[in-house]
UniProtKB/Swiss-Prot annotation:
The keyword Membrane applies. Its cofactor is heme. Belongs to the cytochrome P450 family. It is an enzyme of class 1 (oxidoreductase). SUPFAM superfamilies: Cytochrome P450. This is Probable cytochrome P450 6t1. It comes from Drosophila melanogaster (Fruit fly). Heme binds at C472. InterPro entries: Cyt_P450, Cyt_P450_CS, Cyt_P450_E_grp-I, Cyt_P450_sf, Insect_CytP450_Detox. Its EC number is 1.14.-.-. GO terms for cellular component: endoplasmic reticulum membrane. One of its GO terms (molecular function) is iron ion binding. May be involved in the metabolism of insect hormones and in the breakdown of synthetic insecticides.
Length: 529
């Protein structure tokens, strides 16, 4: 009897081994089916709410092209803005990976959310961990509303028109060094070909180093200088940093668990060391340079002990982000401007004629800040460059109203309330190239910004510096920086296309700020005004 049972047990064991692969395959198929159905239900979110939406792919939502490196943030949101599902809609539902979000399209609705109802959309969706990342979480871009409000109140006077005018001397000094750098590059020749973004990045790095740190970075004289190396370091796509950025932008609720950092450890050490040194040195010397360090020292003397400025890394956080945001956005804008001027010689000739007249009527051929800001056609050119190539090609906010936000009037009358915590996005690039607001939007035409045509612009369709209370605090400084760079280049050079110039501009898919892909090469011909 025992032998019989042993034979039966052996047979069952053999049968189990035979059936095991079948069971495993069946189990895997069941799991895959459940996950797939869950994905389908997840991405039916907008359908269930009766909201128009762009169909999403399982697991990746509507950002597959961005994730696979086929396009940048700006191009991805423009693609969604121009999708057939979004046409004629005030807003459309999208999915950024697993995050349900809205893409706003109607300028009146954009104004409501960015300006009129700012209190209900006062923070951005992306965030970093304030406990681990004391430097990244305190700057004006990433900070949540309470921190942003205090920081903005402190630094808004630094970027006011009068303060920016006082900084003009620092900008003009570096502009002269830009001219010297280009003359050295020319080496007695009649013309030269240069990669423009690199040239402009050296110029803007030296400007931000002077304004934010009160030091001379000497990037134009030595492109391998430490300060310039740190500007490259902050954009270095190392795996660990990419993971942190990915979490901050797509899964901000996990920032605390991951311990995200906006900057690399090396960049943070450099910022702390530089800030401590400069503050100590300036306090001893008593020098007044009309820069950010002057503001820091004044705050240390006047702000009470409970002020936000006494938090760890507060000053370093502001200077670090000014460097990150200031050098890249302005250098890209100058690059795009030179690219368009090289392709549109009639516009370049008119701009250089305006500059020549201003130089001839000025004392010692030196232009004052008021003269530069008063150059009408230069302003039109810069404004049109910022329309065609907005540095920040998309904007975002997060609904922070606990009771949600009623969007029924914008949903064709159908009831719909946006849930708390839901992000909303605005495709600045999409709006700026929408033929509904800008006829022939792909054409570079500074006349769009003539005094007559400005009056015809639709409100909230020109957003290169954002809008509302959380719009770019450094708008005036950024515009002046761009103008000074262009003037010092066009003062001595005519810009032309060369064999390596791309016929159509393509954007770097790895860059957050709108940046030319694989460089922008132009010919600079010696032709002083």
């Amino acid at each position: 009897m025992i032998a019989v049972f042993s034979l039966i047990a052996a047979a069952l064991a053999v049968g189990s081994l035979v059936l095991l692969p079948v069971v495993l395959r069946g189990g895997c198929l069941l799991v895959v089916t459940i996950v797939w159905l869950w994905q389908i239900l997840h991405f039916w979110h907008w359908r269930r709410l009766g909201v128009p939406f762009v169909p999403a792919a399982p697991f990746v939502g509507n950002v597959w092209n961005l994730l696979r490196g086929a396009c940048c943030f700006g191009d991805q949101f423009r693609e969604l803005y121009e999708s057939k599902e979004a046409a004629g809609r005030a807003f459309v539902g999208i999915d950024v990976l697993h995050n349900h979000a809205l893409l706003l399209r109607d300028p009146a609705l954009i104004k409501r959310i960015m300006v009129e109802d700012f209190a209900q959309f006062s923070s951005r969706f992306e965030t970093t961990d304030p406990t681990c990342d004391t430097m990244g979480s305190q700057n004006l871009f990433f900070s949540k509303y309470e921190t942003w409000r205090e920081t903005h109140k402190i630094f808004a006077p630094f970027f006011a028109a009068g303060k920016v005018r006082n900084m003009y001397g620092l900008l003009e000094n570096i502009g002269q060094k830009l001219e010297e750098h280009m003359e050295q590059k020319l080496s007695g020749r009649d013309s030269m070909e240069l990669e423009v973004k690199q040239l402009c990045a050296l110029f803007t790095t030296d400007i931000i180093a002077s304004l934010a740190f009160g030091i001379e970075a000497h990037s134009l004289q030595n492109p391998e200088a430490e300060f310039r190396r740190m500007c490259i370091e902050v954009n270095d796509p190392r795996p660990k940093r990419l993971l942190h950025l990915f979490t901050m932008f797509f899964f901000p609720r996990l920032s605390h668990r991951v311990g995200t950092h906006l900057y690399s450890e090396e960049y943070e050490r450099f910022m702390r060391k530089s800030m401590d040194y400069v503050l100590s040195q300036r306090a001893e010397s008593g020098e007044n340079r009309h820069d950010l360090i002057d503001i820091f020292l004044q705050l240390k003397r006047t702000e009470p002990a409970e002020s936000i400025i006494h938090r760890p890394d507060f000053f370093a956080a502001q200077a670090a982000f000014l460097l990150l945001a200031g050098f890249d956005t302005s250098s890209s804008t100058i690059t795009f401007a030179l690219y368009e001027l090289a392709k549109n010689t009639t516009i370049q000739d008119r701009l250089r004629t305006e500059l020549r007249a201003a130089l001839q009527s000025s004392q010692d051929r030196q232009l004052s800040c008021d003269t530069v800001t008063g150059l009408v056609y230069l302003r039109q050119v810069v404004d049109e460059v910022l329309r065609l190539y907005p540095p920040t090609a998309f904007l975002d906010r997060c609904c922070n109203s606990r009771t949600g936000y009623d969007l029924s009037p914008w949903n064709g009358g159908s009831p719909f309330k946006l849930r708390a915590g839901t992000p909303v996005y605005i495709s600045v690039l999409g709006i700026h190239r929408d033929a509904q607001y800008w006829p022939n939007p792909e054409v570079f035409d500074p006349e769009r910004f003539s005094a007559e045509q400005r009056q015809q612009h639709h409100p909230m369709t020109y957003l290169p510096f954002g809008a509302g209370p959380r719009g770019c605090i450094g708008t005036l400084l950024g515009q002046l920086e761009i103008k000074v760079g262009l003037l010092h280049i066009l003062n001595h050079f005519r810009v032309e296309v060369c064999e390596r110039t791309l016929p159509e501009m393509r954007f770097d898919p790895k860059a957050f700020v709108l940046t030319a892909h694989n460089g922008t090469y132009l010919r600079f011909v010696k032709n002083s005004l």
